[in-house]
């Protein structure tokens, strides 16, 4: 009997990690291309990030995905940032270049690529949330040439800080639903499977069929925001689209191989 013997180890760090489908995507990719590697989930509490990075440096780990809430904190423990990670100001991908740990970011492409077909009709966009995913979302939106971008967050000071850094405008949390918008992007965990699942991050009274809703939450597929947007006739983009595009780019960075986008999407949709 053949025994699978992985030669390379990859994984994802975050907290919590109960909802992650990254192992499914990457392990499928390894199997599809007969790569002797395995990808695991490593739940890592914030106070243990430094310890994890020491482990990454000392054990034969070939690469890692980084998710909430570690996309900023891991930057203290890497040797080199890519240009796009510097632009975003956050890291979601780790890999080795010789003996240096490199931090990269594939999230901005995960936002921009699903929106590209609609970019000409997006003049005014609102981003909900001010964490690591928000930074990537702003970079992705700006790469599409969207000029009028607003950001809102329950903690206003965080929105103010990002607005100043990226030269966009901050809105009060209670004012987020006051105007009609061409695009709304949710980068918070509100609506995610678990304790926040039934919390809608957006007030939808002033939105209509001309509004595009992009919820970066991908589990569940039909979030409370997506359901409300559909009831208003809005165009909706599910979080699975960001997940697919950022994940395919991670796989390419680690292996040099571009996975089949359609097959990857079908694989993930089967699990949602």
Curated annotation (Swiss-Prot):
Active site: 71
Catalytic activity: shikimate + NADP(+) = 3-dehydroshikimate + NADPH + H(+)
Entry superkingdom: Bacteria
InterPro entries: Aminoacid_DH-like_N_sf (IPR046346), NAD(P)-bd_dom_sf (IPR036291), SDH_C (IPR041121), Shikimate_DH (IPR011342), Shikimate_DH-bd_N (IPR013708), Shikimate_DH_fam (IPR022893), Shikm_DH/Glu-tRNA_Rdtase (IPR006151)
SUPFAM superfamilies in the record: Aminoacid dehydrogenase-like, N-terminal domain (SSF53223), NAD(P)-binding Rossmann-fold domains (SSF51735)
Residues reported in the UniProt entry to bind NADP(+): 83, 129-133, 153-158, 216, 239
Pathway the protein acts in: Metabolic intermediate biosynthesis; chorismate biosynthesis; chorismate from D-erythrose 4-phosphate and phosphoenolpyruvate: step 4/7
Enzyme Commission (EC) number: 1.1.1.25
GO function terms (MF aspect): NADP binding; shikimate 3-dehydrogenase (NADP+) activity
Entry's family note: Belongs to the shikimate dehydrogenase family.
Main function: Involved in the biosynthesis of the chorismate, which leads to the biosynthesis of aromatic amino acids. Catalyzes the reversible NADPH linked reduction of 3-dehydroshikimate (DHSA) to yield shikimate (SA).
Protein name: Shikimate dehydrogenase (NADP(+))
Taxonomic lineage from the root: Bacteria, Pseudomonadati, Thermodesulfobacteriota, Desulfovibrionia, Desulfovibrionales
GN (gene name): aroE
């Amino acid at each position: 009997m053949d025994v699978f013997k992985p030669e390379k180890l990859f994984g994802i760090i975050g907290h919590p990690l109960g909802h992650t489908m990254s192992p499914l995507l990457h392990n499928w990719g390894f199997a599809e291309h007969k790569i002797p590697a395995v990808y695991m989930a490593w739940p890592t509490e914030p106070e243990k990030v430094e310890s994890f990075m020491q482990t990454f440096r000392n054990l034969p780990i070939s690469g890692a995905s980084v998710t909430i809430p570690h996309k900023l904190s891991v930057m203290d423990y890497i040797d080199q940032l890519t240009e796009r990670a510097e632009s975003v100001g956050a890291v979601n991908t780790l890999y080795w270049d010789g003996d240096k740990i490199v931090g990269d970011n594939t999230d901005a492409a995960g936002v921009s690529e699903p929106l590209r077909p609609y970019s000409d009709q997006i003049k005014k966009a609102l981003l909900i949330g001010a964490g690591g995913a928000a930074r990537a979302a702003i970079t992705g939106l700006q790469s599409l040439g969207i000029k009028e971008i607003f950001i809102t967050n329950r903690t206003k000071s965080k929105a103010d800080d990002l607005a100043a850094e990226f030269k966009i405008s901050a809105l009060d949390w209670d004012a987020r639903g006051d105007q009609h918008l061409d695009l709304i992007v949710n980068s918070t965990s509100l609506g995610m499977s678990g304790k926040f699942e039934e919390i809608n991050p957006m007030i939808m009274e002033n939105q209509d069929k001309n509004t595009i809703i992009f919820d970066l939450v991908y589990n569940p597929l039909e979030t409370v925001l997506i359901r409300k947007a559909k009831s208003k006739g809005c165009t909706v983009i599910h979080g699975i689209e960001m997940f697919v595009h950022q994940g395919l780019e991670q796989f390419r960075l680690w292996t040099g191989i571009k996975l089949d986008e359609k097959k990857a999407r079908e694989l993930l949709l089967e699990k949602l």
